[in-house]
């Protein structure tokens, strides 16, 4: 899965965080840029399409707009939060935003490897640690802690893969933006 620019291809997935006492089921709606592994995350108590749209609308698209970069396509699995008729909220949102919706082959999660890898990282480095340290009574403080971790992941934590070569995701994106200007 190659992309020549930030925002050209994003991968999205919904990850079951757990059943939290007093809250119920909690899901992470994750989006990862295939260009430099920049990641976004929104916690919600459902897998509904509206929650999957919320992370795009509130976090992802404003980020790329600030950089002056278009979002070309989003790759998802075939989950109900992402797929349906043209009036499906996620499908409709992407169409109205002029973003291509690509889908993985059924039952082939490795096709969406960028976001699957991120899910493993966020599970190991954030959720397993925080859930042992903190009792969360609502989603909001957990989201605040996730937001702080995402700042670390995107701006402080070096990524050793061939795309970033030890750079942080924001460095990879900023490097592209500088070269294009």
Name each model feature, range by range:
Residues 1-2, 6-7, 97-99, 121-181:
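C-terminal domain-tail junction helix/linker
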Residues 1-32, 38, 54:
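Mobile-element integrase/transposase regions
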Residues 13, 37, 74-77, 94, ...:
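Short, conserved catalytic/metal-binding motifs centered on acidic residues
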Residues 35, 45-49, 79:
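A short acidic/small-residue loop/turn micro-motif
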Residues 38-42, 102-104, 128:
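Short small-residue beta-strand/loop micro-motif enriched in glycine and branched aliphatics
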Residues 42-67:
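Active-site beta-loop-alpha junctions of metal-dependent nucleic acid enzymes
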Residues 65-85, 105, 163-166:
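Acidic/histidine-rich, metal-coordinating catalytic segments
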Residues 76-78, 87-94, 101-125, 138-141, ...:
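RNase H-like two-metal-ion nuclease catalytic core shared by retroviral integrases
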